[in-house]
UniProtKB/Swiss-Prot annotation:
InterPro entries: Pept_tRNA_hydro, Pept_tRNA_hydro_CS, Pept_tRNA_hydro_sf. It is an enzyme of class 3 (hydrolase). NCBIfam families: pth. Hydrolyzes ribosome-free peptidyl-tRNAs (with 1 or more amino acids incorporated), which drop off the ribosome during protein synthesis, or as a result of ribosome stalling. Catalyzes the release of premature peptidyl moieties from peptidyl-tRNA molecules trapped in stalled 50S ribosomal subunits, and thus maintains levels of free tRNAs and 50S ribosomes. Keywords: Cytoplasm, Hydrolase, RNA-binding, tRNA-binding. Its EC number is 3.1.1.29. It comes from Methylorubrum populi (strain ATCC BAA-705 / NCIMB 13946 / BJ001). This is Peptidyl-tRNA hydrolase. PROSITE patterns: PEPT_TRNA_HYDROL_1 (PS01195), PEPT_TRNA_HYDROL_2 (PS01196). The lineage of its organism: Bacteria, Pseudomonadati, Pseudomonadota, Alphaproteobacteria, Hyphomicrobiales.
Length: 210
């Protein structure tokens, strides 16, 4: 059994925030693979799903981002899932928009959801890093991640979540390299291989106007 966690903040106020792309991806996995309805469990919302031949629990912690580890730890202990079978989907500032990378363990790169999980559960879980790009200035990061995706970003966000869901059985089977490659090819096929952040797009537009 796998525990697949999407990170985000609960409530409509945060629903389309960049910080919530983990929730969005898990919702799309649930939709594409016809998961059971989400129910309130483990200080979050949880649903069972079959991904290929693998049974998985989808989890969206409702503790707010900084306390995500409480929800993850509760679910992990209940199902006796090894930390190596915990997969966390989260927004990644240090990855270009529309890119995806999978890694095992490593640092938290300032992500409070990952920091909480690492503190309460350990570090050796798998992370699916969903690139949202960086606003260009550290002082802008807080506002950037807690703002909604721009309308111009919505198409690639939807396509990234769909590609993640379509190939989630590979992820559940532990075929991380194949999963990552399939998502990359799907996104490139839709023209998303060189996406700019809104700030980068604005600068490029200004340069073109001069």
């Amino acid at each position: 059994m796998r525990l697949i966690v999407g990170l985000g903040n609960p409530g409509q106020r945060y629903a389309r925030n960049r910080h919530n792309i983990g929730f969005m991806a898990v919702d799309e996995i649930a939709r594409v693979h016809r998961a059971a309805p989400f129910r309130r469990r483990f200080q979050g919302e949880a649903a069972e799903v079959m991904l290929g031949s693998e049974r998985a629990i989808l989890l969206k912690p409702q503790t707010f981002m900084n306390e995500s580890g409480r929800s993850v730890g509760e679910a992990q202990r209940f199902f006796k899932i090894p930390l190596s079978d915990v997969i966390v989907l989260h927004d990644e500032l240090d990855l270009a928009p529309a890119k995806l990378r999978v890694k095992l363990g490593g640092g938290n790169a300032g992500h409070n959801g990952l920091r909480s999980i690492t503190a309460l559960c350990g570090n050796d879980y798998r992370r699916v890093r969903l690139g949202i790009g960086h606003p260009g200035d550290k002082a802008l990061v807080h506002a950037y991640v807690l703002n909604d995706f721009a309308k111009s970003e919505e198409p690639w966000v939807e396509d990234l979540c769909r590609a993640t869901a379509d190939h989630a059985p590979l992820l559940a089977a532990g075929e991380d390299a194949s999963f990552q490659n399939k998502v990359h090819l799907a996104m490139a096929g839709r023209g998303w291989d060189a996406v700019k952040t809104p700030a980068e797009a604005g600068k490029a537009k200004a340069r073109d106007a001069n």
